[in-house]
């Protein structure tokens, strides 16, 4: 039994690695392809990211339902094939009429740092549901930490690999790499706790995570998709150098995530999020004001790490508080709320940056993150309250 679980985790991990390498390459190449090769402005790339975010939200929502009703394995295979298909489409096209749909099915929403699953697409909630089913309840944070670490490191390597190829060729290379991880998913052994479309028993918990996820997505959409374009438009950083910065940022974020289990042990769910994301928020608010490249690079490298450090704790906490046959829908609904809000932020930032108001998205980001952290405290409370609520939830689920 243990060997079977280890094999399944290895298969899932390999798929995660291939997707992350491809995502890391696309994360660097896509802004340069739109801004420098096709010569469109920040507003256009903002609209593409908005469209991609909406598409990812729609795919994610229906994937979450399919995961619970149809099954995890089949849904995961179909969703995993979307990224290589989208990369092939972009490679063979220079028209926005085909690039936008490709970005939508590939999830080029760039709503997270590389370590946090940027360009994850609709596959993210399904992968999380499968991993939660394979991992022991008490070790889920550790498993989520390791997988997020693995994703971040390989995405950072992918960002560095982007130096080796022409901007357009990166999409074909990414398609080949991401496709390599799809066939093995057929051999996954996943416990299928299939639910029915109906009333959610843990809707209150899902609602709280959905609201905090929505604000988190709005804040992400404001700045994360435009960090690389910011360096392109303000500092005129070449792709070869930007890929090194992206590699360093992704690598640091990945190693920071390994500290999540210890962070959870000493600070608990809420304080871990408030401390790490609070510090990161302050850094991003001052980021556009300094206009000094070394400091900007420093914040670009450590800021995303602080933002995603507590991510495995949040993922684990959500899966602990909902029924197994509602997990796919819970993760899907959470992603829909996050990405729908993110598309609003991305559209606004694209307009502001296109009119040279580079600082405004970061200021708005600070206000929204402050509200988000307040809601985490209000909804989930102190460490003592967390433990009491967890016991309550476990009793209800049993």
Can you annotate each of these PLM segments?
Residues 103-150:
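Cytoplasmic helix-loop-helix junction between adjacent transmembrane helices
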């Amino acid at each position: 039994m243990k060997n079977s679980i280890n094999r399944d985790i290895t298969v899932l991990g390999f798929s995660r690695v291939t997707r992350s390498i491809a995502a890391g390459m696309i994360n660097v190449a896509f802004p340069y392809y739109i801004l420098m090769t096709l010569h469109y402005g920040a507003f256009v790339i903002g609209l593409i990211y908005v469209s991609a975010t909406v598409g990812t939200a729609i795919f994610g929502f229906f994937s979450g339902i399919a995961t619970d009703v149809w099954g995890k394995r089949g849904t995961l295979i179909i969703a995993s094939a979307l990224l290589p298909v989208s990369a092939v489409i972009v490679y063979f096209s220079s028209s926005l009429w085909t690039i936008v749909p490709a970005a939508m099915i590939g999830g080029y929403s760039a709503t997270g740092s590389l370590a946090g699953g940027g360009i994850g697409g609709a596959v993210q909630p399904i992968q999380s549901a499968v991993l939660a089913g394979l991992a022991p309840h008490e070790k889920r944070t550790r498993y989520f930490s390791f997988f997020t670490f693995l994703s971040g490191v390989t995405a950072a390597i992918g960002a560095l690999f982007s130096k080796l190829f022409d901007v357009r060729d990166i999409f074909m290379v990414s398609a080949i790499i991401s496709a390599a991880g799809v066939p093995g998913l057929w051999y996954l052994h996943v416990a299928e706790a299939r639910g029915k479309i109906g009333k959610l028993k843990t809707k209150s918990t899902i609602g709280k995570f959905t609201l905090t996820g929505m604000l988190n997505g709005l804040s992400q959409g404001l700045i994360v998709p435009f960090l690389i374009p910011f360096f392109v438009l303000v500092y005129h950083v070449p792709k070869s150098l930007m890929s090194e910065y992206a590699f360093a940022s992704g690598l640091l974020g990945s190693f920071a995530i390994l500290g999540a289990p210890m962070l959870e042990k000493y600070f608990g769910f809420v304080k871990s999020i408030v401390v790490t994301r609070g510090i990161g928020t302050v850094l991003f608010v001052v980021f556009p004001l300094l206009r000094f490249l070394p400091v900007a690079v420093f914040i670009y490298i450590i800021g995303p790490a602080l933002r995603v450090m507590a991510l495995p704790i949040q993922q684990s906490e959500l899966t602990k508080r909902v029924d197994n046959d509602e997990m796919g829908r819970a993760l899907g609904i959470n992603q829909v709320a996050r990405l729908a809000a993110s598309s609003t932020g991305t559209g606004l930032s694209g307009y502001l940056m296109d009119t040279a108001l580079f600082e405004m998205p970061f200021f708005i980001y600070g206000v929204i993150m402050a509200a988000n952290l307040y809601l985490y405290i209000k909804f989930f409370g102190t460490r003592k309250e967390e433990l009491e609520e967890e016991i309550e939830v476990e009793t209800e689920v049993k």
